[in-house]
Structures are given as C-alpha cells and as structure tokens.
Design a protein with these regions (language model features):
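Glycine-rich phosphate-binding loop of ATP-grasp-fold ATP-dependent ligases
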Residues: 1-18, 69-74
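Short beta-strand elements
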Residues: 1, 47-51, 57-66
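Short beta-strand-to-turn element immediately C-terminal to the catalytic PLP-Schiff-base lysine
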Residues: 8-10, 51-52, 76, 111
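Active-site "cap" helix and flanking loop/linker of ATP-utilizing ligase/carboxylase catalytic domains
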Residues: 23-45, 63-118
Length: 118
C-alpha cells in the first residue's frame, strides 16, 4: 500500500454541490452517529473518497489524522492560522469557514527506485 503519491488543491471535481453532498451524506452523519453513541468527536477526520461521474461520494476510508500527502497542498492554500483553528476546534468554537488562497497548489512525493519494496 503506497498511499498517495501526490495531490493537488483545489480539486475541480469538488464543486459546491459535491462539497454539500459530502458534508450532508458522509461527514455530518458520521459525526452525528459518534455523538449519538456517546462519543462526541473533536479532531481531524480524514475521509478518503471517490466521486463518481454523477458527483456522488463513496467512502474508501476514514482516518483520525490528516491525509498524507493530500493535506500538504491544502495547507499551502490555508490563509487562516492553523494554531488558531486547532485552538478554536478544541474549545468547540470553530468559525464556519477558514480563509483560503485561491491559487492552486501541488504536492508530489519523491520515492526511491523500487519503492515500496526497498
């Protein structure tokens, strides 16, 4: 399992409609289910998704950490303070939206010959 070997942000497939579907059909139901089970979640929730041609999300995996390397180009575009966002999240007071640089960002993983078998 080599995981991701590169990433770019923003992803053109993630339109406003796709974003809303992901939040309403995937993220919010998972967070609500954890809360309902008596385990409210505070932290990073990485959803590895596939988006089909109709814009419907399919979950591949969840992780309670940043995705790597997916997060690298996303953080290059973040204009809000990461420290402030984490502190606000821990206090349960996240702003509704972070501030983003509109320019695209790209991250590429460089691996030695033979990876991942070396």
């Amino acid at each position: 399992n080599t995981g991701g070997m590169g990433a770019y942000s923003p992803a053109p497939v993630v339109t406003s409609d796709v974003h809303n579907k992901v939040m309403q059909q995937v993220i919010q139901p998972v967070v609500d289910a954890m809360k309902h089970a008596g385990h409210p979640y505070t932290g990073f929730l990485y959803a590895g998704l596939m988006i089909d041609k109709a814009g419907d999300p399919y979950v591949i995996e969840f992780n309670c950490r940043f995705g790597d390397p997916e997060t690298q180009p996303i953080l290059m575009r973040l204009q809000s303070s990461m420290v402030d966002l984490v502190a606000q999240g821990l206090a349960g007071q996240l702003p509704s939206e972070a501030k983003w640089d509109a320019r695209p960002a790209l991250g590429i993983v460089v691996a030695s010959k033979g990876y991942p078998y070396v």
